[in-house]
Each structure stands twice: as C-alpha cells, then as structure tokens.
Design a protein with these regions (language model features):
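A detector for short, charged/polar N-terminal pre-domain segments
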Residues: 1-9
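Short histidine
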Residues: 7-8, 25-30, 40, 69, ...
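N-terminal helix-turn-helix DNA-binding core of bacterial DNA-binding proteins
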Residues: 12-53
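Alpha-helical linker/hinge and terminal dimerization helices associated
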Residues: 17, 27, 64, 94-104
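Basic, amphipathic "hinge/linker" alpha-helix immediately C-terminal to the N-terminal HTH DNA-binding motif
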Residues: 22, 73-94
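Canonical helix-turn-helix DNA-binding module
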Residues: 44-72, 76
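C-terminal regulatory/oligomerization modules of transcriptional regulators
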Residues: 95-148
Length: 148
C-alpha cells in the first residue's frame, strides 16, 4: 500500500484540501451527512465501508474540523456525527461532483437519485464559477497571483 504524504506545508489550497477530503470515503460520508445521516451505522450501511475504515475516516473528519461528535439527538447513549460550518461549506463541492457525475457517468435515462430544490422539486442550476462582476469564467479566464 502506498503511504499518503501530507500536503500541509504546500502553498496550494487544493493539495491542502485533499489532505482532509481527498479519499472517496470522506466525500461519501460528507454526502450522506448532507442527506441527514448522523449515526455510525447509517454511514456504514450507506457507504458499505468496513467498520475499521469508517471509524478511521470519521475520526479524520472530526480531527480536520469537518464533522463533530455530539450526544445523540434521541437521548440515547450513541453519538451523532454532524457537519460543522467547515463541513457545510463543502455543499458546493459535493453538488459540483454530483452534477459532474450525472453528466459523465450515467447513460441517458439511467436511473439514479435526482438532486432537486426541496421547495419546488425543480432541478438546480448547474454550478458555475463567476467573476466578481457576475461574468461566467472558464479555466482560461483565471490566473494565479501571489498574495500581497
């Protein structure tokens, strides 16, 4: 097995972010948390992850401040895992992956859950990167600049 290298010392925001959410289990757990799952068993059933892998990934998400453990909402002795503000800020990331996956990995008419606006049940707009003035940007319209 290849040992992962930490990117915490790099100056790249993408690389640092991948330290926290760069494996598929992490994003599947976050996806499920957005869908209302809170318990270890719910995450395990939905993702199919082995208990040891799921425990490690949940601990990592807690350590990175993406999720937190709280007493169970039903008063039982269980713990719930809930998204923090940092975790909730991943909603556009998960939505972009959802839309990308729908576009490239499903055949026309192939059945899968549809992401819809809860209020009116209509499709949500495709996520776009916008300039400060509202223009739609492509990757060729952006550049990297030093801070300061």
């Amino acid at each position: 097995m290849v040992k992962r290298v930490s990117h915490e010392a790099t100056n790249c925001p993408v690389a640092r972010s991948l330290d926290a959410i760069g494996d598929w289990w992490a994003l599947l757990i976050v996806r499920d948390a957005f869908r209302g799952k809170r318990r270890f068993g719910e995450f395990q059933k939905s993702t199919g992850a082995a208990k040891n892998i799921l425990a490690t990934k949940l601990r990592s998400l807690v350590d990175f401040g993406i999720m937190e453990m709280v007493p169970a909402s039903d008063g039982s002795t269980y713990q719930d895992y809930i998204l923090t503000e940092k975790g909730l800020d991943l909603f556009p990331v998960v939505t972009a992956l959802w839309q990308w996956g729908e576009k490239y990995f499903f055949e026309a008419g192939e059945s899968h859950p549809l992401l819809r606006d809860r209020l009116n049940r209509k499709p949500i707009r495709k996520l776009e990167v916008l300039a400060a003035d509202g223009r739609r940007l492509r990757h060729t319209d952006t550049t990297l600049m030093p801070q300061g």
